């Protein structure tokens, strides 16, 4: 799970934060846990920050630590709650690409809860649009863009998706 806030332990180093689920839920030896945590940090390009503490790294780096921690146990499913919350557009794109690459690389099913249309366009294969707790629409990006559904909520979502796709991922 990748939380909206990175949800890191301030008193633990970056390496220790990634090791935390391994310490709690794996039967690995201490050396194996370190090796796995370092591998995950390397995968998100943060191996050089392993001895730093969360307060010493940027918000984008904290999100990448959260991603490394989320994949440490090699899950089949990855749940992301607003993974780009509080990040600038450039860093958001990096996080989107990282989630997409890791999901593809490890063949994980990923569920992303987001309001970020760039994320929807960039990494969404299948989209479920929920409005006021009700499923309004489900399908691929192209199905949504070419949909003839006409409720106000469906039109609003469709127009936002079309506008964002024309604007591009700047």
Regions found by a protein language model. Name each.
Residues 15-23, 34:
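Short helical segment in ABC ATPase nucleotide-binding domains corresponding to the A-loop/adjacent helical element
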Residues 53-57, 61:
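Conserved ABC ATPase signature
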Residues 72-76:
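A short, proline-enriched helix->beta-strand linker immediately N-terminal to the Walker B motif
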Residues 78-81:
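Catalytic Walker B motif of ABC-type/P-loop ATPase nucleotide-binding domains
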Residues 89-91:
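Helix N-cap at the start of a conserved alpha-helix in ABC-type nucleotide-binding domains
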Residues 114-115:
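H-loop/switch region of ABC-family ATPase nucleotide-binding domains
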């Amino acid at each position: 799970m990748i939380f909206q806030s990175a949800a890191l332990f301030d008193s633990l180093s970056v390496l220790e934060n990634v090791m935390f689920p391994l310490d709690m839920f794996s039967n690995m030896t201490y050396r194996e846990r370190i090796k796995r945590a370092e591998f995950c940090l390397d995968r998100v390009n943060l191996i050089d920050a392993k001895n730093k503490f969360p307060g010493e790294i940027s918000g984008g780096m904290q999100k990448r630590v959260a991603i490394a921690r989320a994949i440490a146990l090699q899950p089949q499913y990855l749940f992301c709650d607003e993974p780009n919350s509080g990040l600038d557009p450039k860093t958001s794109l990096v996080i989107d690409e990282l989630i997409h690459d890791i999901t593809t690389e490890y063949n994980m099913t990923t569920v992303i809860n987001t309001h970020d249309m760039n994320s929807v366009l960039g990494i969404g294969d299948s989209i479920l649009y929920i409005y006021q707790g009700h499923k309004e629409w489900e399908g691929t990006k192209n199905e949504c863009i070419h949909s003839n559904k006409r409720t106000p909520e469906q039109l609003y979502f469709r127009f936002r998706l079309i506008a964002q796709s024309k604007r591009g991922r700047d």
